[in-house]
């Protein structure tokens, strides 16, 4: 009978093979449509979104109230940590879905407000997950790792491969800086067509709830696998 850790190693191999594949032709076509839609968004709105992401990155890098007290239970098994993170992920997915439905119902003005709100929810989840896996988020290097995990979840094919290399070797070749312009560009461009449709009155509510739920699901899977890999590499 295989151990939990051995099972996770196999899951990681399968996940990596799937996750690192280039996007499908349909996905690339959707991105082209999305780019056209983004061009219709006023420059002032684009500036607000860019500034929100920049400030978030700077706040996290410098230290912020996102930081959680270090977990006292240091002897948790990987299985226990995974279970606790899954519970936390379910909590945040529900919060994100409810928030997306609420802002989506309000049309363009409230829909635009969803971008910084969802960004905050994602970052809070990442800090909680890092703490549950036993990492100290008061350490600047760990906060930079969090930003790398975020980028991995919401980046283009080429940038995703570049970020994965940094994450794989993090504990031996730590990065000490963050290109926030690349960060915000990749994140903004990743946000799919559904998030743009959230700005449309009436259909915005169900679209917003679904999109936010799926984006948190993706972030949760990426986060779990990045921290699983780090813990297993230490053993």
Sequence positions of predicted segments:
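Hydrophobic alpha-helical membrane segments of integral membrane proteins
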Residues: 111-119
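Terminal, membrane-proximal amphipathic helices
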Residues: 1-99, 127-235
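Conserved mixed alpha/beta catalytic, RNA-binding, or beta-rich assembly cores of soluble enzyme
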Residues: 118-123, 129
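Transmembrane alpha-helix interface/packing and boundary motifs in multi-pass membrane proteins
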Residues: 99-112
């Amino acid at each position: 009978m295989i151990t939990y850790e051995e099972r996770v190693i196999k899951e990681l191999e399968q996940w990596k093979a799937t996750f690192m594949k280039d996007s499908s032709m349909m996905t690339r076509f959707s991105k082209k449509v999305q780019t056209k839609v983004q061009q219709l968004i006023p420059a002032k709105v684009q500036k607000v979104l860019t500034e929100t992401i920049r400030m978030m990155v700077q706040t996290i890098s410098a230290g912020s109230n996102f930081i959680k007290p270090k977990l006292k239970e240091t002897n948790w098994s990987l299985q226990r940590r995974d279970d606790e993170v899954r519970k936390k992920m379910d909590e945040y997915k529900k919060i994100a879905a409810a928030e997306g439905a609420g802002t989506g119902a309000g049309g363009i003005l409230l829909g635009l407000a969803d971008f910084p709100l969802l960004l905050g929810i994602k970052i809070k989840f990442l800090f909680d997950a890092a703490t549950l896996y036993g990492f100290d988020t008061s350490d600047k290097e760990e906060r930079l790792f969090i930003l790398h995990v975020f980028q991995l979840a919401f980046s283009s094919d080429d940038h995703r491969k570049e970020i994965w290399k940094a994450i794989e070797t993090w504990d031996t070749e730590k990065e000490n800086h963050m290109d926030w312009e690349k960060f915000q560009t990749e994140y903004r461009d990743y946000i799919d067509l559904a998030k743009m449709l959230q700005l449309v009155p009436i259909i915005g509510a169900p679209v917003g709830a679904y999109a936010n739920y799926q984006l948190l699901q993706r972030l949760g899977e990426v986060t779990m696998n990045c921290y699983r890999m780090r813990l297993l590499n230490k053993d």
